[in-house]
């Protein structure tokens, strides 16, 4: 409906084909301040209206767009013509991939049926790092959050530990909810991370360095959940860190790979199940990378 309403944005009403919602170069541009002249030149464009319409599906089925929307939203009250074009590109991606949503499966997930697990990752940036956490079950995401931390991190380790702490809160809430409906989690919920120092801090009481004292409360809270066997941090390589799609703008190949790991399509594709999948879903030959 958003595309139909704004068909005047494209020549002959034809929407360009987009494979990613946000390119690395566009992401870098959105970090720059908007000048008064640029805003005055673009203030009549319907930036907030279109942004709001795109945000709705990202809450439910287009979770892979969360990082793009998070970054674009920083210019909600002050935008330029260039940032409006970037917003339109995100809309084009959403329209191009409108047939790709979320696909849950039964018996295909290596973690087991109805077993909760999660991914937590963060970049390291000033003034605040961008973190992403994804909780999954039956091969597909059930929640995805991509947003800046509320505090300034002093190292990559601290940024990763902060995101782990935030992820433990999501996991604990979901474990309680699942317990109420009879889906008790008998084992600790795995939280995948790609930073070994952060994992060591969370699993070893003697490994908290002096420069990390400022995050004592978060570390202790996360560590308590590990000791209570509610969560278990597990290392995974950066290439397979699904939450990476919520921390930075990625190239086409890596974005599609992580997107389809998160939305469950890659798992179904790899299983060889006789299921008709959209053409833009990752090819079976690329899953084994």
State what each model feature region is:
Residues 1-289:
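Long, low-complexity, charge-biased intrinsically disordered regions
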């Amino acid at each position: 409906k958003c595309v139909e309403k704004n068909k005047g944005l494209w020549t002959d009403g034809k929407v360009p084909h987009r494979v990613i919602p946000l390119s690395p170069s566009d992401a870098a541009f959105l970090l720059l301040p908007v000048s008064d002249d640029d805003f005055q030149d673009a203030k009549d464009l319907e930036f907030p209206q279109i942004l709001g319409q795109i945000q709705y599906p990202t809450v439910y089925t287009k979770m892979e767009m969360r990082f793009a929307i998070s970054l674009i939203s920083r210019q909600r009250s002050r935008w330029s013509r260039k940032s409006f074009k970037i917003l339109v590109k995100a809309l084009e991606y959403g329209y191009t991939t409108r047939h790709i949503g979320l696909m849950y499966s039964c018996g295909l997930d290596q973690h087991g049926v109805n077993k909760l697990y999660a991914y937590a990752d963060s970049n390291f940036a000033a003034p605040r790092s961008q973190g992403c956490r994804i909780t999954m079950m039956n091969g597909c995401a059930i929640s995805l959050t991509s947003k800046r931390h509320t505090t300034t991190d002093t190292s990559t380790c601290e940024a990763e530990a902060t995101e782990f702490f935030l992820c433990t809160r999501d996991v604990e809430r979901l474990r309680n909810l699942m317990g109420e409906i009879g889906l008790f989690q008998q084992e600790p919920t795995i939280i995948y991370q790609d930073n070994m120092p952060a994992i060591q801090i969370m699993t070893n009481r003697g490994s908290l360095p002096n420069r990390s004292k400022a995050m004592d409360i978060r570390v202790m809270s996360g560590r308590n959940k590990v000791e209570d066997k509610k969560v278990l941090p597990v290392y995974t390589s950066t290439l397979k860190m699904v939450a990476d799609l919520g921390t930075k703008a990625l190239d086409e190949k890596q974005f599609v790979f992580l997107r389809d790991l998160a939305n469950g399509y890659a798992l179904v594709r790899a299983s060889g199940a006789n299921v008709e999948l959209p053409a833009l879903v990752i090819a079976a030959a690329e899953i084994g990378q």
